[in-house]
Amino acid sequence: MELPRLENVDLSGKRVFLRVDFNVPVENGKVTDKTRIEKTLPTIELLIKKGARIIIASHLGRPKGQVNPEFSLAPVVETFQSLVKSKVYFSKTVIGEDAIKLSKELKNGEILVIENVRFHKEEEENDPGFSKKLSALADIYVNDAFGAAHRAHSSTEGIARLLPAYAGLLMHKEILELSALLHKPARPFVAIIGGSKVSTKIKVLTNLFDKVNHLLIGGGMAYTFLKSRAIPIGNSLVEKEFEVQAFQLIEKAGVAGIDLQLPVDHIIGDQFNEKAKTKSVDKMGILDGWMGMDIGSKTVSNYEKIIKNAGTIFWNGPMGVFEMDKFASGTMAIAKAVAKSKAKTVVGGGDSIAAINKAGVADKITHISTGGGASLEFMEGRKLPGVEALKKKTSE
């Protein structure tokens, strides 16, 4: 996939509108995970080196088109400032005369971060007038926000049609790594798909079907698959409306020669909290009044053997309720197995990344995708509006 590149563009003295994904967790006014900020630093450093005057835009959370101090980028700017050597300014407005004035006062290599673009409802509406007001801040547009590329918003899609537009280094890397998974994976290709709901993963499972050799299922979504096979699941999470599709996927895997694996044992709890009583049960099923909270040791062992021999691994979604320590062992074991593998490894989704960090093995993963919903949609084979807007620039 060809996207317009920054490397050979003269940016000296030019105002560059850089859309990033600084949608990071903030607690008590402090950023608790800097991963997404750190991932876009190579693009920012390249722009500084080229003498650009950088205007950074991002969203944070869901303020529903209204100014809400809880979702201000101010604490994010504080963290960002500590990671770059350049002078960083913060605009409390997104558009208008004050923001334009600040953008024009920037010197080469300096940075202006504007306030949360979602403080304006027009942002998510991809309003042409709002896109035009954003474009008034800059001469050139760069999109490095792969995590927001699946949204057709003003700052990800609308503005790209009004200014010379380029992809940032992170955007390029994400597209390159995920495209390689879909088109030329080293074999065997193992996909590990977890998380709580089948409904959010059914499309990616379907798209991966003709590409993977092994499909390892875990997390709450596994219980819809097990229920579809009439295996007792007690009070475990189940999406009844997806039972038929889950059963059809199991059947389809058998016909296609894909090794689709489901948990054969479970760590169960009698309630959904840290105070829950726990026990281990095998494939005979889960008792009424109990719910599956993690994969068991036999399942871990089965999955580890497949992971060990993989050529390529894609992991999205935890194996259990890993936020609770007593139900974290399955996810932690899979994280360590993936890290130990000699395969090319790609991990996507907030919970999987949190698990990799919790296990202390992030540095052993080939590529950690910042995408979340965007990487899932890409793996579903869908077109991402933020990427398509850049592609159109290359064909114009």
From Swiss-Prot:
One MF annotation (Gene Ontology) recorded for this entry: ADP binding
Keyword Coiled coil appears in the UniProt entry: no
One Pfam family this sequence matches: PGK
Enzyme Commission no: 2.7.2.3
Catalytic activity: (2R)-3-phosphoglycerate + ATP = (2R)-3-phospho-glyceroyl phosphate + ADP
Methyltransferase listed as a keyword: no
GO cellular component term of the entry, any: cytosol
Keyword annotations from UniProtKB, A to Z: ATP-binding, Cytoplasm, Glycolysis, Kinase, Nucleotide-binding, Transferase
GO biological process: gluconeogenesis; glycolytic process
Major location category of this protein: cytoplasm
Binding site for substrate: D21, F22, N23, R36, H59, L60, G61, R62, R118, R151
UniProt-listed CDD domains: Phosphoglycerate_kinase
List of residues binding ATP: K201, G292, E323, G349, G350, D351, S352
Subcellular location: Cytoplasm
Broad EC category: transferase
Associated pathway: Carbohydrate degradation; glycolysis; pyruvate from D-glyceraldehyde 3-phosphate: step 2/5
Subunit relationships: Monomer.
Protein family per UniProt: Belongs to the phosphoglycerate kinase family.
Full protein name: Phosphoglycerate kinase
Organism (species): Leptospira interrogans serogroup Icterohaemorrhagiae serovar Lai (strain 56601)
